[in-house]
């Protein structure tokens, strides 16, 4: 038990422990003994029965009934369909049982229609009426057949009535009569029927359920919204009131957007909205309202009328359209006619392809291409707006390919959803827009696209005009359907006028076209367009045209190949035949703006066989889903999940990554629902902390119990309450529902948030808690886990450091348990804060008679710094003289008063100097600079950073990892045992790495198998990084981008790090052979006596390990017998193990020894794995073991070859041999079924292994005398050729790979150069480079593992592997992802030569603060304006100013140093000498291209130069300046007080309490009289409690708790005793 939560018992709503909650049980008062069960449903039933028996059953009954009713409905479903519910269907049923209306967001094959048909049957069995609305007559017929089939299977009889156009006259009349009389249980019609027959037949009908199967068709008549609401039980009057709320909310939104807010008007609107909402809720309470289920749309539900569902039913219709892509994007540079490339591609790729022709080539070329492909024997048809017959033929399988024009609203681009048929897309040119300079036949979206692209080329005045026009046009068309936009475009083309709003849009469209025509006449603009690398300017038949990429069409068209379905996202392939390089560049750039993870490869570099295999595997799955034959295993892949984050902004942002979400109101909270293929995800914001310590129980909210005679501290929590009127936050009610400060009843209780979360938790299979990635976030996650545990079967923690789509998906894959150590640290932090704060605050109240005062351990020393600085400030006033010299230099002279007319330059130093950039921001440096440069308070900066944060790697289990103690073990074992000390490589030298996190994830997807020339391989996820040398350059490359012919870094000559040695009893203990531990010593003593008291050594030296090696090679274990098929080893056994009795036969020797047999068995002889302790031994022991293995199973014929069936052991030996500098290769003889370990470096073998050989030394000597010794080779010929040598030495290299020792020798003669320096570093490096022979992609289902470590890498299978940005961080480390972001921006926007990647420190739990995309501030504003980047809240000018600060600092940190001509001069004045420094000139701009240099520019000076004084100013001021907020935060960081997450809060508290004020203008901090008195009192009376040193010590102790190095209960006890000693 760690804590008690008041009011959280899921049965009686009383107090309950965290232990009971996490075990999914009610409190001890309800149930004396807990009930434990792995099966969630069984647990619900068992607890319910126990509560009922005890007579304490209350709210638990609701949990039980819900599960029971779901089971009953599932039984009927199984009878009706033959299947059990899918996870998502179970979620939908739970909502229906609880009377909730909702929108279904679900991919193909999720059974939406089947569910709608079934649930209407279920309602009918309960005497309730249902209405199913479908778009067309065929679907009416299909639904009727489906229901009739279900009724027959379930043996259920209901009154089914349907109406469609294919009925005979008499059947129609009968159906209409039954509808008129309400003589039905289930009614099925089309949307058209509802629109035309509502008044006549349906207006007076009330339905318990309406199921709308296709909302797009349903919404074509917007009045269907009102009609459906009336049929559910709403009156026209209450619908009218809801419409008023919608209009009032629009007015309120406009008011809130104004910078000058009319608070009175806002309050008035809020009250009116609240009043109408209360009326609506009252109406729903008094009237029985039915349930509406709306199946997902493919388009957006536009218009305000749809919002009636939000106001009356609590949900908003989302879109089923997904923005997820699982596409291998490729390109091909044409070397022959495009048509021939297409033919070649079709023959390679097979059937099921779409071929898109760029719009500039048009329908004529599409027809020609279709005819040409037919002539080549392909079954292909052209599809256009006028000819759609090909679609039907394609769907039936009568043709294999479709050709169409790549235009956004084209039939082939948008109207096709055939995930089981479409495998790939070929683009016969880059999708593009082409504009003539006079903009003939403009469309609205093309005009917007062109304006967006060229605005940056316009003069400032025109740019401003263009931005306004652009913004107006985008805003006006936001909710206009496509067919209405086409009418506006036609009106412009034909010179017609329209009416009302449409005419207004037409006018703005016309102005935009005229604006473009005007600016495109400007030659300077045309010149800039021609120079731009992302736009193309072409002259065709004497006419100029601009071409820009049509990225929306590419996304839609390629997206036909990758669709969401039940189980994931189908893999697709896209091939672009590049017909214009500049437009292609533009397309790539825009795709990366939209998709952070976008990557495009050359077609010929793709492993086509593997890609097609995976594509076809997905198509098979989809077919099974569509046919209803999918296996239960695949069904289980689609889980319903609830993701909980802290803030609503973050929830909105995450939801937007996956399409247009459906929304539901749950109490005061909004839940967003999206599909991500394998999960139906509901995203909800918790609102941050929901619980805090109570004030009226225990010692300031902490119970002090006894545990084995020691104090045991248990915090008591209750929900946080906040008054909406006065802002007061509290925990305990003085009077229920009333704010204790102002008496208002307008109080929000976080209990409502808990209720909302519990309501949603009931619906889902798993909960993912994504609170912030720090100790505070971990504690919030722990609270959420505890209070939701009884309501959901599975709860996990997810952690992400940047809010991007890949980061979220990765976090979901890598979901983990709560980190209890982090929670413990936060418990200590909060309890310590409460105890100190309450005790000292009460003392302040008594002394100063003011209950608004407070104190804290951290804020007191910080207040002290400000008080002390103010004292220094007031005592340091002096005279200053400011002079401006004739050359413009400003000089300030301290302690000076009087006149000065001339000065002399006494001394000058001028030199060239490199100026390095600063590292990226940490929290403290960001707060300092935001204070210094932008004038932002710490609190404001943190809030802006939070807004920006919210807007915006693994291997298989058999992978061997090297630990820092020498052991080599499988990564699965390392993770399971939490092995912290790993071996990594830093600067190509070995370095110990501490594992900060251990990752174990479930994987069902592709992995890459990288096979190396030395026989080793690594099996990893596509994004797992390896250290690679390619074309003479070293860098991290993800597995998916590694190519055959690359060289991978492999550990080499590190030196062995193990040093263990054992006695026999110690080895028994290490191996866990406890049953023999005591008897072993006794047995040895007995043997000593038998041998005339001769002393027997039980130290296991190299002889013992040699014997172990022999047994590994040619030994076997039979019970207690050790049998060895190598008789020559007998003398060694007699020498090393004198206490055993040896037996012999014709071909073997052996001995019987129960203990030793068990030892060898556990060490790895036989079937078991080689025990990890072996590689922790001293080097000579391991070498002796290898020698024994060679003496048993080795041969020496030109090379040393060890043969064994135990490939697992040879693999480990191979890694070890590389570590001690012996190059080797692994090879499998498939025919013989054995592995070979081949060593060609006989020189090293002789040094390391040979001394321990006993049987085959002579064999080795013979081979060694005649064989060539092959050592390590480096793949550096391309660099080697660039070396320059002194006369007489010729540089000639024939092979790519050169022996390391030869490189070293030759380098001695080479002239100094960067190439020589690089090659020297490779020679000295503790890695070798092994060629990649083959890359395969395989499907893998199972566990994968990884670490987060203090270095960026660890050793896996001998290979250097990379291990798996948040604004609360003290790290300056930049990840590979961050470096890639910088590289893309710097190379594209500034110049490749400026880029210099820097890691800036070792990797930890956090990364430096950085942008997540290569987008600068100007471009970010444009992309938000264009709607390409969507954000959850409007960003202000201050947001962009802070973003710019972060962006420039980060990009500068990844650029080359600036080189300046530096000047430092001593200027002699009549008063004193003054130093002046700065730069005369910038010799190389480097990082200063993006950020200002920290020095001022000054003119060149000469020694002895006399300069006239132009201007003199005299003033008096303090020498010491007051602190700003930034200065204080820098001190906190420097002195180890506070944490990144608390810096801003501490300063804010001092300001709020009135201890400190901030001056206007310069924003300096000044202590108030109150602040000075409070500080003096605290430091006088309680110095030992609040001193800076004690505070710093406590920070370290809390870090130790977080790292599991200190027990949190011991720390609390120490704190408690300390407070008792000084205060109580």
Curated annotation (Swiss-Prot):
Mg(2+) binds at residues 646, 772. Pfam families: DEAD, Intein_splicing, LAGLIDADG_3, Topoisom_bac, Toprim, zf_Rg. It catalyses: ATP + H2O = ADP + phosphate + H(+). It comes from the Archaea. ATP binds at residues 89, 106-113. Zn(2+) 2 binds at residues 723, 726, 739, 742. SMART domains: AAA, DEXDc, HintC, HintN, TOP1Ac, TOP1Bc, TOPRIM. Residues 636-1624 are annotated as: Topoisomerase I. PANTHER family: REVERSE GYRASE. Introduction of positive supercoils requires the cooperation of both domains. The helicase-like domain probably does not directly unwind DNA, but more likely acts by driving ATP-dependent conformational changes within the whole enzyme. A beta hairpin in the 'latch' region of the N-terminal domain plays a regulatory role in the enzyme, repressing topoisomerase activity in the absence of ATP and preventing the enzyme from acting as an ATP-independent relaxing enzyme; it also helps to coordinate nucleotide hydrolysis by the ATPase domain with the supercoiling activity of the topoisomerase domain. NCBIfam families: intein_Cterm, intein_Nterm, rgy. This is Reverse gyrase.
